[in-house]
Regions:
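N-terminal positively charged helical leader segments and presequences
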Residues: 1-89
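Glycine- and other small-residue-rich loops at beta-strand/loop junctions that grip anionic moieties
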Residues: 5, 29, 103-104, 129, ...
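Structured adenosyl-cofactor binding patch, chiefly the S-adenosyl-L-methionine
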Residues: 14, 141-145, 209-250
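RNA substrate-binding interface of SAM-dependent RNA methyltransferases
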Residues: 15-21, 88-182
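Surface-exposed amphipathic alpha-helices with a cationic face
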Residues: 45, 163-167, 241
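Active-site/ligand-binding-proximal alpha/beta "capping" segment
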Residues: 174-228
Length: 250
């Protein structure tokens, strides 16, 4: 099955149905219609989606994650939005743009976890490069617990050019770096914000760091001196959310 053509797992499939994703059909493990699979069946019937009962071997053959939980949805390819749609979406909500820019994130589980946290934290959209970055696959979808359906994701040819573009639109760009200028809790995230998160191994490139308005770091006192991309981005995103909540209350 090609990239982006299946969604695996009960919660992920339920979210796909609820959000109106174009689903061709849903495959369910024959004779295992219990628990939340009944919810999948009920929602699918309401949306008039074809349900097919198949044996476990068929599901195992199609599964890309090995964690299908007895249900796989056959879907159309994921549709990325245009980069400008993210800022427009924030304006429509009368909110200051909150964007996450990912640079060469290669691990699909990390990408999925970042998407999940971003959606929870109110991020308006995620930017990824067209090359050298994992795309939205079934593994990413499942790792995001279906959050992929609730957040905008766009691809750009050049991350640094995109950073220049949004800076011209009044968005402050903060790069995550171990040797940052200040701690993330010292930074002022109350305006329009873009967080730039680098790859698990290399971090941000020198040019990307130079493009950022401020480099921020996370306090670490243990012997291990790095966090994976999903944890680092989660800490940063929650700091932005915290400041926005406090700012709204003032």
């Amino acid at each position: 099955m090609g990239e982006n053509n299946i969604i695996e797992g009960r919660n992920a499939v339920i979210e796909a149905i609820k959000t109106g994703r174009n689903i061709e059909n849903i495959l369910i493990n024959k004779g295992k219609t219990m628990g939340s699979i009944n919810t999948v069946i009920k929602l699918a019937r309401e949306k008039k989606i074809v349900i097919k009962e198949v044996d476990k071997k068929k599901l195992e053959q199609l599964s890309e994650t090995g964690k299908h939980q007895g249900v796989i949805a056959i879907v159309s390819s994921y549709k990325y939005c245009e980069p400008d749609e993210i800022i427009q979406y924030a304006k429509e909500r009368d909110e200051k743009p909150f964007i996450v820019i990912l640079d060469e994130i290669e691990d699909p589980h990390n990408f999925g976890a970042i998407i999940r946290t971003a959606e929870i934290c109110g991020v308006h959209g995620i930017i990824i490069p067209k090359r050298r970055n994992v795309s939205v696959t079934s593994t990413v979808y499942k790792s995001s617990a279906g959050a992929v359906e609730h957040i905008k994701i766009a691809k750009v040819t050049n991350i640094n050019s995109y950073i220049d573009d949004i800076k011209d639109k009044g968005i402050w760009v903060y790069g995550a770096d171990m040797e940052g200028d200040e701690y993330c809790y010292e930074a002022d995230f109350t305006s329009a914000v873009a967080l730039v998160i680098g790859s698990e191994g290399k971090g941000l490139s020198r040019l990307t760091m130079e493009k950022c308005d401020v480099l921020v770091k996370i306090p670490m006192v243990g012997k291990i001196t790095s966090l994976n991309a999903s944890v680092a981005s989660g800490i940063m995103m929650y700091e932005v959310l915290k400041q926005k909540i406090i700012g709204d209350r003032r």
